[in-house]
Amino acid sequence: MAGALAGAGAAVVLVGRRKAELQSAAEIIRESGGQAVPVTADLSARERLPEIARRCQQPFGTVEILVNAAGVNLREPADKISFKSWDLTLNLNLAVPFFLAREFVSGMRKKGYGRIINIASLQSSRAFTNGLAYGASKAGVCQLTRAMAEAWSRDGIMCNAIAPGFFPTALTAPVFDDPQTERWAAEQTAVGRNGRLEDLGGITVFFAAPASNFITGQTLHIDGGFTAK
């Protein structure tokens, strides 16, 4: 997603906890002719979000496009979910996207242009085994996106969500590490395969661009037709 935005001309700030991975991703973008700067930070620390937002705006100025891609899925059985794991999941997946976005809204409002792209999930509308807390958080993302749109779209800030199907990421490693489960997931789609990371690039650029000027509060499933069946 970051690579697609950089390829479309955006100057990208990559934020996360894993310094080496961030630096590597930024270097790949720069080698391809794009602009990218890594910012190492723990987004789950809500009290530090104002500071993180300031750091994000130092390299290139006002943030006009925010992709809320941080997330966690602990895959715990319902009977084993603790208050701690529930709070961790709901905090990072649902609270942080709102409070981080709010840090950038004033700058977007002054520019008269802003794009907030949240990450929903198949579990926003489907119940999966050991996905109670994660599913609750991702269902919340869809309503959060609508509420953000209602609050900020009149200021030129469009708020939409992408709901990916099964893509090979750190969160879905348990699926892709098991050939049988990976095959099952592919068979649930209409196209007969799981997602490739490049499949997310086009919709990310579209939601970030002026082409989406009249689209807000929407959640679009990028799942190869998983939810169509």
Residue ranges and their predicted role:
Residues 77-78, 82-90, 116, 185:
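Substrate-binding pocket helix/loop in short-chain dehydrogenase/reductase
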Residues 121:
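Residue(s) in the substrate-gating loop at a strand-loop-helix junction
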Residues 67, 153, 158, 215-217:
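Short, small/polar-rich loop/turn modules that mediate ligand/substrate recognition or access, typified
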Residues 101, 137, 145:
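Active-site helix of classical SDR
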Residues 126, 205, 216-229:
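Short C-terminal tail/terminal secondary-structure segment
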Residues 1-13:
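Canonical Rossmann dinucleotide-binding motif of NAD(H)/NADP(H)-dependent dehydrogenases/reductases
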Residues 106, 150-154, 213:
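Alpha-helical segment proximal to the catalytic Tyr-Lys
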